[in-house]
């Protein structure tokens, strides 16, 4: 919403979500499957987009073998096999060369120092411009930061509020264009 209000064209590619998207989004590509989403993103990358904001990780794990239809009751315990899903930011790395890329690193149960380290590693491995790092246990907690902005040099800056986060994202975009 913030980027749109500051004059930027925004395209949204989303999976299954409970978040309601703003009415102003002209192009909203909804994908029910992570692989379908990756194909859409690769198609969009052919248009040489200037800025990519990867706001949420696609499923880290996906169901190994999906079963169509209903499973009959009284069949006993179910074991569901999971496998690691494709890392979209890595898959898009070469297709987005030259673009500003901002990612998010959302973790739980780790120290802030380790979170920043993982965010910086993401920047290096996926060729990101910057990453917004945050932790589940901090979300919505009074006095806890909204996250940390981590740059390509490993420097990190506290983002106290959602507005701080939006301003940081906008600044990164404006400073790298």
Where are these regions (language model features)?
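A cross-family phosphate/adenosyl-ligand binding-site feature
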Residues: 1-177
């Amino acid at each position: 919403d913030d980027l749109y209000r500051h004059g930027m064209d925004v395209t949204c590619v989303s999976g299954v979500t409970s978040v309601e998207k703003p009415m102003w989004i002209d192009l909203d590509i909804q994908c029910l499957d992570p692989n379908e989403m990756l194909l859409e993103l690769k198609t969009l990358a052919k248009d040489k987009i200037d800025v990519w904001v990867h706001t949420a990780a696609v499923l880290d794990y996906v169901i190994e073998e999906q079963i169509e239809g209903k499973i009959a009751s009284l069949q006993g315990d179910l074991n569901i096999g999971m496998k690691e899903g494709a890392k979209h930011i890595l898959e898009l790395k070469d297709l987005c060369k030259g673009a500003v890329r901002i990612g998010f690193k959302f973790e739980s149960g780790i120290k802030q120092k380790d979170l920043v380290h993982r965010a910086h590693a993401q920047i290096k491995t996926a060729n990101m411009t910057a990453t917004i790092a945050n932790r589940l246990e901090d979300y919505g907690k009074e006095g806890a930061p909204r996250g940390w902005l981590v740059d390509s040099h490993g420097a990190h800056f506290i983002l106290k509020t959602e507005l701080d986060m939006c301003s940081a994202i906008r600044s990164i975009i404006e400073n790298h264009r």
